[in-house]
């Protein structure tokens, strides 16, 4: 059975939203220190947001990799399972600037069809550029400021003199990168912001990288964002 873009999502209250920026982050993708996830959570907690679209998990997810969460009380299973969810929200920064935020569980299947759906929404909304947020393991110590590296779909989007880990890399692409590349081929450029996370903090929450990502996003996109997060000391400080 063929899948059309509109089969993959259900419109929300803000379905007709207009925004020049699409921000992408999926749980389960490349994100050392949960840097991107914490940053997105900070935005959603601190800023006004409305639902634009909810994507069909039954079509996009492999439930063996995104298992529903069930609660059992006194040996009785609750019917209210927490299902994996991928959504698109309209978020307004502190100055009222609109941002489309695509977040939630990373879909397992139908990436091309999913991207077609995102492209259609972007065209209607007037999106001009995309950003994605990631934490990447690095040799940087936690006592240093967190550098943010920038990956782009076009060389013209790269900042002059920006920090670079290396000039050549190959890695299995997360869906955020896949979407940005496909949208780039259709005229919507993309930047991936990569916050450096100490290797020894990669498997735990590292808010310092999240703050650095939000600060970089605010700078590149000219947004007013809640960039300051509480950063607990590393266990190695004690």
Where are these regions (language model features)?
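N-terminal short beta-loop-beta anion/metal-coordinating cradle
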Residues: 2-104
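Acidic, glycine-rich active-site loops and adjacent beta-strand->loop/helix elements
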Residues: 27-29, 61, 105-108, 135-138, ...
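Short, solvent-exposed amphipathic alpha-helical segments in soluble enzyme
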Residues: 38-43, 117-120, 208-211
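Hydrophobic/aromatic beta-strand patches that form the interior of the parallel beta-sheet core
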Residues: 53, 100-102, 131, 189-194
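Internal, conserved structured core segments that host functional sites
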Residues: 97, 105-156, 179
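Catalytic cores of processing enzymes, dominated by hydrolases/peptidases
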Residues: 139-220
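An acidic, glycine-/histidine-flanked metal-binding catalytic module
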Residues: 223
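Conserved small/polar residues in nucleotide/adenosyl-binding loops
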Residues: 230-237
């Amino acid at each position: 059975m063929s899948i059309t873009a509109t089969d993959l999502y259900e419109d929300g209250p803000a379905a007709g939203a207009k925004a020049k920026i699409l921000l992408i982050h999926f749980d389960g993708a490349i994100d050392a220190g949960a840097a991107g996830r914490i940053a997105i959570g900070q935005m959603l907690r601190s800023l006004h947001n409305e639902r634009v679209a909810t994507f069909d998990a039954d079509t996009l997810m492999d439930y063996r990799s995104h298992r529903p969460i069930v609660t059992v009380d006194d040996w009785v299973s609750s019917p209210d399972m927490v299902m994996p969810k991928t959504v698109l929200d309209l978020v307004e920064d502190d100055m009222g600037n609109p941002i489309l935020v695509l977040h939630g569980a990373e879909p397992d299947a139908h990436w091309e069809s999913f991207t077609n759906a995102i492209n259609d929404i972007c065209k209607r909304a007037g999106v001009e550029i995309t950003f994605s947020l990631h934490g990447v393991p690095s040799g940087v110590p936690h006592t240093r400021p967190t550098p943010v590296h920038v990956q782009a779909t076009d060389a013209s989007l790269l900042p002059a003199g920006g920090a670079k880990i290396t000039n050549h890399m190959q890695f299995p692409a997360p869906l955020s990168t896949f979407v940005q590349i496909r949208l780039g081929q259709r005229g919507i450029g993309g930047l991936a912001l990569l916050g450096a996370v100490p290797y020894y903090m990669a498997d735990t929450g590292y808010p310092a990288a999240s703050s650095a990502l939000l600060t970089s996003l605010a700078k590149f996109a000219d947004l007013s964002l809640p960039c300051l997060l509480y950063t607990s000391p590393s266990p190695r400080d004690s």
